[in-house]
Structure formats: C-alpha cells, structure tokens
Amino acid sequence: MIQRKQTLWLLLATVAAVLTFLYPFSTGIEKVDNTTMERTVEINAAENLFLILLTIASVVISTVAIFLFKNRGQQKMLCIIGLLISLGICALDISLTLKLVKYVPALWALLPFIIVISYFLAYRGIRSDEKLVKSLDKLR
C-alpha cells in the first residue's frame, strides 16, 4: 500500500489539508460593519463554516482513498471528487482573502494548491496502475 506513489500523494493531500487548520492563508485588515474602524484578521480553514466542511471532506476523502488501494475505480472517483473539493477550497480561500481591505498572503496560502496538485498526481498514478494491470493481463 505505502509503496504505491499515489498513496504518498494522497497522504500529502491529507497532511496539507490538516495544516490549513493550523496556519493562516493570509493576514489582513477588515472593516467592521459600516464604521471607520478596522481590525486585523487571519484567515485559515477554521474561519468559515463552509471552508471547515470542505476541508474536513477533503481530509476524509483522501484518507478513505488511501485504504481503497485494492479498488482502483473507487479510488479514482474519490480523487476526482477530492480534486473538485480542493478547487472549491482554493476558490473560497481567494474570495475570503479578496474581501479584506489590505492583505498579506502567507506562505501557507500555497497549501490549497498543494492539495489540488496532490490529488491530480494521485489520479495519474492510479490511472498508470490501471494501464499496467491491463497490459499485464494482455500478456497472460
């Protein structure tokens, strides 16, 4: 299980998704309602309920996909779903950051994009495994 490269990519996606709860994507200044007051905020995955749900879904999907190593079809489907969810995380992260008056993106803002890339590379690994199995079946 662990020797397959897509398992490592899925594990990277899981770790990156968990890290989005701990580290902020960006720090910025937000206006308080319709006043002239401003406050400093840090945006991470725990800031928005929808972002929390998407991130938890991404963690669960990548973890389940790791243990479905014997069923490549389901693993591929979970990778596609995880990829779409992680694209939603990226879009929501960008929209939350752009709502700030002034913002400074952190290095951790790359984590959602790392999740997307990890899911994509895991999908490619699963697909190459399927091709390898089909070619070996033809040799029999």
Summary of predicted features, one role per range:
Residues 2-3, 8, 14-57:
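Interfacial loop at the N-terminal end of multi-pass membrane proteins
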Residues 1-2, 6, 43, 72-75, ...:
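Membrane-interface extramembranous regions at the lipid-water interface
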Residues 122-140:
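Cytosolic juxtamembrane helix at the C-terminal end of the final transmembrane segment
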Residues 20-24, 65, 90-97, 119:
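Structural signal for membrane-spanning alpha-helices in multi-pass inner-membrane proteins
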Residues 8-19, 53-63, 81-88, 110-117:
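Lipid-exposed faces of alpha-helical membrane segments in multi-pass integral membrane proteins
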Residues 104-128:
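Alpha-helical membrane-associated segments of multi-pass integral membrane proteins
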Residues 39-93:
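The feature represents the first ordered module of a protein
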Residues 83-110:
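Hydrophobic alpha-helical transmembrane segments of integral membrane proteins
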